[in-house]
Amino acid sequence: MDLRIGQGYDVHALVPGRPLIIGGVTIPYERGLLGHSDADVLLHAITDALFGAAALGDIGRHFPDTATEFKGANSRVLLRECAARIARAGFTIQNVDSTVIAQAPKLAPHIDGMRANIAEDLNLPIDRVNVKAKTNEKLGYLGRGEGIEAQAAALLVRV
């Protein structure tokens, strides 16, 4: 059995005037994440983990931030396209585990919606998708509320 594990990471700065979208969920907050696309830090980390597990590079290789067609892109669309490319490469996604690190806002009320979106986009049962939320205990740039980080791991199997 050919199992593949991938790890993904992303971070974006929090700025005024942008919506805060994490895991495809718009979260009420006075600031949002800065980025070329919708800056969904969680979906970007998951996308990187999936591409990495299949040895297909990273999100920037497939959806470069220099390409105008990805300006303001919905990261759920990118995640679905990633899943299609993974399938074309001969893999099925087994599960995804992820962590979002944010001092604020509280993410717990939004976790179920994030999991549902990710499961839908990856065509997985929801019990194969996990999202955790942590603070940075007020340490560093994350603890000062300057940004939000996400980490993800994905398991693929070659079919």
Swiss-Prot record:
Domain of life assignment: Bacteria
GO biological process: one example: terpenoid biosynthetic process
Binding site for 4-CDP-2-C-methyl-D-erythritol 2-phosphate: D10, V11, H12, H36, S37, D58, I59, G60, R144
Catalytic activity: 4-CDP-2-C-methyl-D-erythritol 2-phosphate = 2-C-methyl-D-erythritol 2,4-cyclic diphosphate + CMP
Pathway assignment: Isoprenoid biosynthesis; isopentenyl diphosphate biosynthesis via DXP pathway; isopentenyl diphosphate from 1-deoxy-D-xylulose 5-phosphate: step 4/6
EC number annotated for this UniProt entry: 4.6.1.12
Record site feature (Transition state stabilizer), residues: H36, T135
Ligand binding (a divalent metal cation): D10, H12, H44
UniProt remark on cofactor binding: Binds 1 divalent metal cation per subunit.
Swiss-Prot/TrEMBL cofactor(s): a divalent metal cation
GO MF assignments: 2-C-methyl-D-erythritol 2,4-cyclodiphosphate synthase activity; metal ion binding
UniProt keywords, alphabetically: Isoprene biosynthesis, Lyase, Metal-binding
UniProt xrefs under Pfam families: YgbB
UniProt record similarity statement: Belongs to the IspF family.
Quaternary context: Homotrimer.
Chain's role: Involved in the biosynthesis of isopentenyl diphosphate (IPP) and dimethylallyl diphosphate (DMAPP), two major building blocks of isoprenoid compounds. Catalyzes the conversion of 4-diphosphocytidyl-2-C-methyl-D-erythritol 2-phosphate (CDP-ME2P) to 2-C-methyl-D-erythritol 2,4-cyclodiphosphate (ME-CPP) with a corresponding release of cytidine 5-monophosphate (CMP).
HAMAP family per the UniProt record, alphabetical: IspF (MF_00107)
Name of this protein: 2-C-methyl-D-erythritol 2,4-cyclodiphosphate synthase
Natural source organism: Paraburkholderia phymatum (strain DSM 17167 / CIP 108236 / LMG 21445 / STM815) (Burkholderia phymatum)
Gene name in the database record: ispF
